[in-house]
Amino acid sequence: MFQQIIFQIAIKHFQLILLLLFFVSTAMAEKVKVRIFSQNAISSVTVSFDLGQYSVYANDTVLVEAAIGEGVSMTLKPSGGKVSISSDGYFYGSFSKVRFMANDTACILCLNPSNVKQRTYEGDLIVTATKQNTLLLINDVEFETYIAGVVQSEIYGNLTDIFRVQAIISRTWAMKNLHKHKKDGYNFCDHVHCQAYLNRCVRPDIMLGTMQSSGVTIVDSTGSLIETPFHSNSGGQTANSEDVWRNALPYLRSVDDTFSLAMRQSDWTKTFTVEKWLGYFSKTHKLNTSNDSIRFQLLSFEQPRRRARILGVPLTKVRMDLQLKSTFFSVSYDSVSGKVTLNGHGYGHGVGLSQEGTIRMAQLGIAYDSIIRHYYSGALLHFNHDSPKNYVENYIQQIEQIIEDDKQRTTQVKSKKDDWLGRLFRIRDREEREEVYDETKQDIESDWQFKFGETDTTDTIKNATPAE
């Protein structure tokens, strides 16, 4: 009976899944255009040929054929809305668009801007001039080659499963946001506005992890690609999506994340003068910091569990304005020195996958798919290379695993709840018990994501006879 129910769930979404299979397989065969050096004003770049043979097109005409070993390098500069090209003292002219087109499967260009550290990229290079008299550089590259470059730029480590996880979430994001910069004439930029893509991938272990996950994305129960945000370190607890952005998404729920503790970015501190700290809330958020209650709360704010606001002020706004590593911090005040210290945890927005948590989980031997499910609640892996039959079987197995995980989580919740109730019962004084209950109930509910019934609230807690 259970298997039949699961199979019916899979069949219900099967047509959607087949459409997704076709879409993903089609898109992944294509190239993507990525704007590189997007954070820099490039006034000049020298291009040399590291591997393979290239045809250099000026507008739509072949200007020169160049290959590795020929010692050819070309310098490009903006000139009156066009791109000028010169090489070894010879001036080729100025053109609306210049394209370095790869003629071999493996072709690599070395780009050396005048004001930025050089990089190497595979595939084609398209160069145009901007209205600001700078160069716009676009790498036209195979999708999976791009993903490998993103993985190398976004995460550290030395285990294949680390790179497999990052490749899957980066691929999912790229597929879902394929037209993010459509109006600009390319797919993605190379910065965190999209995903970091700061060089071609040169590490074999990253290439292996990307290849082993080729075609794999993350979907929800309808077969739709999910949002896959990630951050450096959660500080021990990830954040709900609605606490950072606008929408509450069922797969972006806050989870305990002990794997992120004791890592490079797990803790931080930042100090302010009391005048600057209180002045920020007074000037920016119009709080009356001369009020004793408000002042006390601002100087003794605590977050044993993640919270979204401090006195109604979104912590995301505080983080941005004061350039904090995260919103997960507590406040202490030294009246002698007049210093306010923020003791913080984690690095980044806190939603979705923690990269350092992923690293630790992989080090402990936890499989890549379990890592993904830990951070994206109820998510399913979509294997593009599967046949329809294998895909449905895999889909069913994943749903069964999610149900089993939910059973285990329910058991853990009941155990924790019973332990918590037991500790309350040991408080002999009824008023003290009610006070402790009111103080801890919200955190317990948030932690275990359940609501107490009226019986628990009225009969079990407040009217219980304390244990001897």
What are these regions (language model features)?
Residues 2-6, 15, 21, 26-468:
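Conserved, single-site charged/polar hotspot
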